[in-house]
Amino acid sequence: MFHILSPLRGVLKSSATSVRIDNTVFRLHYRVTVTGLVAASLLITARQYFGEPINCLEKEGIPPTVLDTYCWLHGTYSSEAAWRKAVGREVAYPGVDRGDRRGFEGEGQTSSSRTYHGYYQWVWAVLALQALFFYLPHYLWKSLEGGLTRNLTLDLGKAILKEEEKAEQLHLLTEYLHRAKRMGLHRRLPTGYLICELLNCLNVVLQAVAIDQVLGGRFLGYGLAVLQNSMSTSSSPSSWPMAYDPMLRVFPRVSKCEYFQFGSSGEVESLDTICLLPVNIFNEKVFLLLWYWLLMLAVLSVASLLYTLITAIILPAFRIALHRLTTYRGEGEKKVVDGQFCSTGFGIGDTFVLALLEKNLNPLHYHDLLICLEEEKECTAELCKEKVV
């Protein structure tokens, strides 16, 4: 199993050491969620771990492989009436009834009394497509950011740095930030980031709605129904029959298939067979975890969007004011760097860039950067060295 997921190992390893241009919630979308969806998609296609995705009972004169392939391509179905019957007395399995074959003259069950299951052959593709949509906001933000944070970090992300190199790099960084402030180079960055976070929120909601459509309108309440079923079963196992298991309603492990062929007289014959769907044992767990994950991700994404809106748009100086730094210059002289320069000299975009630098610079070097930026004038290399040593 691990050799199938080995390509994802390199992605996680490289992302752990990359420059951070967003927050933790944002990374949950394009790292954790994308990795999980791709892993699930790959595992579903790995038949050596789950066997054949469908196995149907043999019918006389029909090769088993033909019947399996036919039912896989055309889908299986469950009887709606069978879900309300007692398992073991009236039906052999939830959703599987006897004598429910449709007649050609309209007798018996109609198609409206059946629930057809054809989604299982598309589950891997749906998960892969979801992974793509979860990555798109990050791709958009990465394009808008354009590697700015990586370029500005220089070597200041290292803990140990020679004083001459440190002073020179602080000088270059300080000079750039002051020039960018005057030219307004960073004005659009906070808006772009906010739009990408909004896309994250919308994507979670749209993905849940899309899955609900694929699963026949049974996904939005899936996780809650499973939780209620588990609580009812644990409190009174005998009062909650297997027929009401919501996991079986959405992902049946046993269903029926109707096969048409020409008989010996030349008339069309309809044959019913029972099919096992081993792949649904995995599917039901994947979508249950996905339901709870999307719920958690939606809550965190909305909270992150509000935080970004407040700290980066409404109160741009508040983000740095949260991290007040007390520094000392000389003996007994106390100087408080509280980010007030951001509210007087730096705009929203500039404070946003400083917040990105805070995520990537060594705390000591970021501390010294704020000291240099405190001055209204641009710091020279000598002044930077004097202020930070």
What kind of feature is each model-predicted range?
Residues M1-V389:
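Membrane-embedded alpha-helical segments and the immediately adjacent membrane-proximal loops
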